[in-house]
């Protein structure tokens, strides 16, 4: 009976810790982590497209983009790279500091999430010096690496037909995060 009580107590402590981390994430959202972040107009997707790198050995296709100002403002730029059967799509999204757009990411990063299955994993991590997360599915050879820059921009590399997430880390590593953070 005591063992069962301890295990219930331990489960309660873990649940309380999870709720505390969840509340911390919501607090960061409400105040933009500093309390002084207010939504701004997203940058032009053309400005973000200019930051997509050329990568040796990969064919870079024509970038695309879109921007919307209502009901939720955001801007997104994309480009696809191919090498044989492998494909990598880079995306850059400007949330305009709209914390509702960033809620899933902020909570994921705050919680220090990690999950592993027989086919792969998901985890929060550092990506090119930025808070980020990584997913890998070994059965399909698909992966994703994301970085949150300046509490505003999300930089993503999604790969299909690749060997592991190292190549995705390399692609994101070629993005100048200082220039991304300075976009206005």
Task: Name every feature range the model reports, one short phrase each.
Residues 34-138:
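Short, solvent-exposed recognition patches
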Residues 11, 15-18, 22, 44, ...:
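Stable alpha-helical elements in mature extracytoplasmic
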Residues 1-40:
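Low-complexity, Pro/Thr/Ser/Glu-rich flexible segments characteristic
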Residues 23, 27-30, 52, 56, ...:
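Generic secondary-structure transition motif, activating predominantly at the C-termini of alpha-helices
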Residues 19, 26-29, 48-51, 97-102, ...:
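Generic detector of leucine side chains in alpha-helical contexts
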Residues 8, 15, 83, 115-184:
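A short, solvent-exposed beta-edge/loop patch
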